[in-house]
Regions:
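Serine/threonine-rich low-complexity intrinsically disordered regions
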Residues: 1-2, 21
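Sec-dependent N-terminal signal peptides
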Residues: 3-14
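Hydrophobic small-molecule pocket/channel-lining residues, especially in calycin-type beta-barrels
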Residues: 16-146
Length: 146
């Protein structure tokens, strides 16, 4: 019986496979986003599970930068967005995807959202499905450039 339990546990771990590594430099593919986006957004990601560091650069009329530090173990992290808003986030793995619960504090209001990150196109694209109270569902696609 013990051998059966061990075999099931080992098989279950093998079936899940390795978790995605989001490390790299990613450029937003405006045409693939839904709804379509404009602007020039780049993510530089360092991912050494459970640590995840995301540097966002958005170029437009004004260039903006943001640095977020997360852990993938469900611990809450606090960061400041490119627009100066405060974010409280937690992230956990679920079915090989990274699931974020986010609370944004904007003008004293608490706005809740969530994101699901996954790699697609054999790891060449990062897909972020974002659900927010004010904007509904958005799908952001980033293409690996490095």
């Amino acid at each position: 019986m013990k051998l059966l339990v061990i075999a099931i546990a080992v098989f279950g771990l093998a079936a899940d496979g390795p978790l995605p590594d989001f490390s790299g430099t990613w450029k937003q593919s405006n045409e693939q986003c839904s709804p379509k986006r404009s602007g020039d957004v780049t993510l530089k990601i360092e991912h050494r599970d459970p640590k995840l560091v995301v540097e966002t650069t958005a170029k437009g009329r004004v260039e903006r930068h943001a640095l977020q530090r997360y852990t993938t173990d469900g611990a809450e992290s606090t960061s400041t967005g490119a627009d100066g808003d405060e974010f409280h986030s937690s992230a956990v793995w679920k079915d090989g995807r990274l699931v974020f619960d986010i609370t944004e504090i904007e003008d004293g209001k608490r706005l809740k959202s969530n994101e699901i990150w996954s790699l697609t196109d054999e790891g060449r694209s990062l897909k972020r499905v974002r659900r927010t109270e004010k904007a509904g569902e958005q799908t952001l696609i980033y293409v690996r450039i490095q």
